[in-house]
Amino acid sequence: MSNILQSVPVNQKVGIAFSGGLDTSAALHWMRQKGAIPYAYTANLGQPDETDYNAIPEKAKAYGAELARLIDCREQLVAEGIAALQSGAFHISTAGVTYFNTTPLGRAVTGTMLVAAMKEDNVDIWGDGSTFKGNDIERFYRYGLLMNPALRIYKPWLDDTFIQELGGRKEMSEFLIKSGFDYKMSVEKAYSTDSNILGATHEAKDLEELSSGMKIVQPIMGVAFWRDDVEVKREEVTVRFEEGRPVALNGVVYSDLVELMLEANRIGGRHGLGMSDQIENRIIEAKSRGIYEAPGLALLFIAYERLVTGIHNEDTIEQYRESGRRLGRLLYQGRWFDPQAIMLREAAQRWVARAITGEVTIELRRGNDYSILNTVSANLTYAPERLSMEKVEDAPFSPADRIGQLTMRNLDITDTRQKLGIYNDVGLLTGNTSVALPRIGKDSDKK
């Protein structure tokens, strides 16, 4: 039996994730006119482009909400963001520049905390502004049903009647004005923006064309570092971790992770750190393109990864990276709280993050241009004297030890040579100019 309603649930409570923008304002008032009883829930995610959260619930009541609540999600969102950082849950990157899954993290928190608030008010029908082509419709569906198995979904944007009556921004604006609201439609940007305390996503409209680059975006968490008239000064910053948790920036200790993230955003934002242009696969396997900002997470990630590589061995780092990519994809798909994701996340937090204690000094320049100046940790397994080119006392191994080690390599070198000979005999290497290998002959040919 489907949980999705395709027409207005008359005389029933409907919870709507209310942002205060045109779409949700028009939808809320329209549902009220059609006989539904709207309950508005607004998530305070620390959106950098939101100036007055307290005004949003009052606006919802004016549009017809029976009840309007503001839910502070910032602490939980930052906690989930740090968990993603600790486990490297980022699978989308281009040429080493990472997208930090900030929108999927925001949806995980919004989808669970708002539905939990709805349950307190005995609201079992939920609506939001996600469209049928995007990722969010599935993310919210999964998280909502995880929190409330009795939940039903009503999305105005899946209702043909709503689409016919209010099919676009112009129609929605006219509808509100006709209903007596002094609504002035904002100047439409060349792209859409969604943000939270962890990062911002810019996509759609002009950005759907790959010929439109990052330069058409006005950053909301940083500076347009590509512009010559924007002054960006070099800056040294120190980041300290204790047992995998960021605790200090530039020597200032933060007991509140929300305040630490805000300061990290300010520092990274001064340089445009963490901006990226990505082509990605949506959940439905169609490709989309986005311009992303995440100045604070990018700063913390540089320091965290530096400590990871200085503390852990190669196999642990490999496992951390492989599991992190898998976990990042699960997060992107709306499966952050699924058992397979919890297993990957908690393994990384326990066995990788808990060893990460130390301080990293970084010089930030423009955009993602930076240098690591110093790394200090009592847990470092990096020891320069082990491989020093100078003569050292108590060397960990001698030339004779290396001769023995190289001699043991003869076993796999011989095996490799035999396999290459087999490939040559069956014609796999003959004439293959893409494989830069010397000609392999049989040992018997040299006798």
Swiss-Prot record:
The keyword Amino-acid biosynthesis applies. GO terms for molecular function: argininosuccinate synthase activity; ATP binding; protein homodimerization activity. PROSITE patterns: ARGININOSUCCIN_SYN_1, ARGININOSUCCIN_SYN_2. InterPro entries: Arg_succ_synth_type2_subfam, Arginosuc_syn_C, Arginosuc_syn_N, Arginosuc_synth, Arginosuc_synth_CS, Arginosuc_synth_type_1_subfam, AS_cat/multimer_dom_body, AS_multimer_C_tail. ATP binds at A17, F18, S19, G20, G21, L22, D23, T24, S25, A43, G129, T131, D136, D194. L-aspartate binds at T131, N135, D136. Pathway: Amino-acid biosynthesis; L-arginine biosynthesis; L-arginine from L-ornithine and carbamoyl phosphate: step 2/3. One of its GO terms (biological process) is argininosuccinate metabolic process. Keywords: Amino-acid biosynthesis, Arginine biosynthesis, ATP-binding, Cytoplasm, Ligase, Nucleotide-binding. Homotetramer. Belongs to the argininosuccinate synthase family. Type 2 subfamily. NCBIfam families: argG, PRK05370.1. This is Argininosuccinate synthase. It comes from Janthinobacterium sp. (strain Marseille). The lineage of its organism: Bacteria, Pseudomonadati, Pseudomonadota, Betaproteobacteria, Burkholderiales.
